Amino acid sequence: MSQISSDDVRKVAQLARLDLPEDKIATYTGQLESILEYVGQLQQVDTEGVPETTRAVEVTNVTRVDGVQPTAVREDILDQAPQREGDFFRVPKILAD
């Protein structure tokens, strides 16, 4: 794997819009190099026959089943409104003509 230079770290910091102090460049260069070496090791792992996944632990949906539920009678609901007009709620006007 290629060596990471200080200029590479500066470029990544600039692309990420990070204000990276000059005295930290050497530290981050070494850390980034270590990360890339680890990624190189991961690329060598034999994953033949391993199913693809998006997470380490399988997640299942725990919500209730969607089904038809009884509802209140329309007239009972409309009767609770401060104002109504036929089968609709009447609300104050909020937009000008």
UniProtKB/Swiss-Prot annotation:
GO terms for biological process: glutaminyl-tRNAGln biosynthesis via transamidation; regulation of translational fidelity; translation. GO terms for molecular function: asparaginyl-tRNA synthase (glutamine-hydrolyzing) activity; ATP binding; glutaminyl-tRNA synthase (glutamine-hydrolyzing) activity. It catalyses: L-glutamyl-tRNA(Gln) + L-glutamine + ATP + H2O = L-glutaminyl-tRNA(Gln) + L-glutamate + ADP + phosphate + H(+); L-aspartyl-tRNA(Asn) + L-glutamine + ATP + H2O = L-asparaginyl-tRNA(Asn) + L-glutamate + ADP + phosphate + 2 H(+). Its EC number is 6.3.5.-. Keywords: ATP-binding, Ligase, Nucleotide-binding, Protein biosynthesis. Gene3D superfamilies: Glu-tRNAGln amidotransferase C subunit, N-terminal domain. Pfam families: GatC. InterPro entries: Asp/Glu-ADT_sf_sub_c, GatC. Belongs to the GatC family. Allows the formation of correctly charged Asn-tRNA(Asn) or Gln-tRNA(Gln) through the transamidation of misacylated Asp-tRNA(Asn) or Glu-tRNA(Gln) in organisms which lack either or both of asparaginyl-tRNA or glutaminyl-tRNA synthetases. The reaction takes place in the presence of glutamine and ATP through an activated phospho-Asp-tRNA(Asn) or phospho-Glu-tRNA(Gln). Heterotrimer of A, B and C subunits. This is Aspartyl/glutamyl-tRNA(Asn/Gln) amidotransferase subunit C. The lineage of its organism: Bacteria, Bacillati, Cyanobacteriota, Cyanophyceae, Synechococcales. The gene is gatC.
